A protein has these predicted regions:
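Structural recognition of the beta-strand scaffold that forms the well-ordered cores
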Residues: 74-77, 112-116, 138-141, 185-188, ...
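His/Asp/Glu-enriched short active-site or ligand-binding loop at hydrolase and phosphoryl-transfer sites
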Residues: 193-194, 198-235, 269-280
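Short, low-complexity, disordered segments immediately C-terminal to signal peptides
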Residues: 1, 8-34
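Active-site beta->alpha N-cap acidic-glycine motif
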Residues: 35-141, 145-156, 173-177, 183
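An active-site-proximal "capping" alpha-helix that borders the catalytic cofactor pocket
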Residues: 160-178
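Charged helix-capping and loop-helix junction motifs
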Residues: 96-99, 224-228, 255-259
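C-terminal domain-boundary segment and adjacent tail
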Residues: 45-68, 251-280
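Acidic-and-aromatic substrate-binding clefts and catalytic sites of carbohydrate-active enzymes
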Residues: 84, 92-93, 116-125, 188-195, ...
Length: 280
């Protein structure tokens, strides 16, 4: 789990899968295309990138009048990670869920987007259904296998280009089979690693890939205050924060959240789901 989760939340997550400085993920040629509005009943998606590649969303961009950039909104996102080979560890008592974190989000009334793995949904179907039927949340796709969609990527095994679409569709199927209803057509690459080949492979799925501009640093952290401070220092109007929903490898996220939320609200921020952030 070490390398997998570290890559999932790493500040070095990047398009090519190679390390860069700890800033926002590097943009690809397909990043930040123009918004495209779906039917009124559905969540927004982005228009395809150059050459029809899967579009990539990292944060809310400024509108022509700058209004969108000055709107003090922020999206907290949580990766529900569990790799395909960790069922035995879960059966042995290791916790890859974090019901306390979800309870805190409900208590604090924080709309959030959970990027859920298909394997996680299979292991915790009741929790997946509870999250996915609560209008406070929306569930997005974080793959089924947590294999890398471009390599190298923090030691993750690679998924072949011909299997990428099936991996994503398998995850959506596993999530929906739990009874989750609030499922959005967004996808987060394991490790944040992608390239043009993976963007091309996923284009037929119609998903919008979602990255981030603020890394919480909660993976394997032991100091909740340090995690909270990193988020509070990094957030700007329109930011998208990556955190985790797994007690096994992100044990202080719940504690950090209880400082992050009041801290940002004191600064005038409003919490939104990715779908609202994308809607602009």
């Amino acid at each position: 789990m070490g390398g997998a989760l570290a890559g999932c939340a790493s500040p070095e997550a990047t398009r090519a899968g190679t390390a860069v400085l700890p800033t926002a993920p590097e943009k690809s040629a397909a990043a930040s295309p123009s918004p495209s509005r779906p039917p009124e009943s559905g969540p927004p998606v982005l228009a395809p990138g150059p050459g029809g590649l899967t579009p990539v969303f990292e944060r809310r961009a400024a509108g022509r009048d700058g209004a969108a950039a000055s709107d003090k909104v922020v999206a907290l996102t949580f990766d529900a990670d569990m790799t395909a080979d960790q069922g035995r560890r879960a059966a042995g008592g290791e916790h890859f869920d974090n019901p306390g974190l979800i309870a805190s989000l409900r208590r604090l009334k924080v709309p959030s987007t959970v990027f859920m793995m298909g394997r996680w949904a299979q292991e915790y179907p009741d929790q997946a259904r509870s999250i996915g039927t609560d209008p406070l949340f929306e569930i997005a796709n974080h793959s089924f296998s947590h294999h890398a969609f471009s390599s190298p990527c923090y030691g993750l095994p690679a998924v072949a280009a011909k299997d990428m679409r099936a991996d994503v569709e398998r995850a959506f199927t596993a999530i929906r089979r739990t009874g989750a209803r609030h499922v959005v057509p967004y996808f987060r690459f394991p490790g944040g690693c992608y390239d043009d080949a993976s963007l091309k492979a996923l284009a037929p799925t119609g998903v919008t890939a979602v990255q981030w501009d603020v890394v919480s640093g909660d993976a394997f952290a032991t100091d909740a205050d340090a995690v909270a401070e990193q988020v509070l220092e990094g957030v700007r109007p329109g930011s998208l924060v990556v955190m985790h929903c797994t007690r096994s490898a992100a044990p202080v996220t719940d504690d950090a959240l209880r400082r992050i939320v009041p801290g940002l609200r004191e600064r005038g921020y409003r919490f939104v789901k990715v779908s609202e952030l994308m809607r602009g």
